[in-house]
A protein has these predicted regions:
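Sec-dependent N-terminal signal peptides
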Residues: 4-15
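N-terminal alpha-helical modules
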Residues: 4, 18-116
Length: 116
């Protein structure tokens, strides 16, 4: 997973480098990218919840709470080796964005399966 995150970091670093010139700018862009991914997740989650029966809602709500704990803990773990460095927020935010996008894909699959 570390290799994947480092690969993603360097990929996004070089893409971001065209517009962001400083570490602060890269961190700000990563924050905006994560917020965008989180917004898409919340939109998909709300749509899915609205279509579920009471029992399914309870199960999804608990699953989402558990997933949030996992996401936050995992990304803190991935960013920890960079403690004290200005790159740490970028590593953390990139991890949050990628895991959030993956969760959104899973929720969209559930939504698609529900609509079939």
């Amino acid at each position: 997973m570390k290799k994947l995150l480092l690969s993603l970091f360097f990929f996004f670093f070089f893409i971001s480098a065209a517009t962001a010139q400083t570490q602060l700018e890269m961190n700000e862009k990563a924050s905006l990218d994560y917020k965008k991914a989180d917004g898409e997740l919340n939109k998909t989650y709300k749509k899915l919840v609205s279509l579920l029966d009471k029992n399914e809602k309870v199960l999804l709500i608990q699953a989402q709470k558990d997933w949030i704990k996992y996401r936050d803990s995992h990304c803190k773990f991935e960013a920890d080796p960079y403690t004290g460095g200005s790159i740490k927020p970028l590593i953390l935010l990139t991890c949050l964005e990628e895991i959030t996008k993956e969760r959104t894909k899973h929720l969209k699959e559930s939504l698609k399966n529900l609509n079939q």
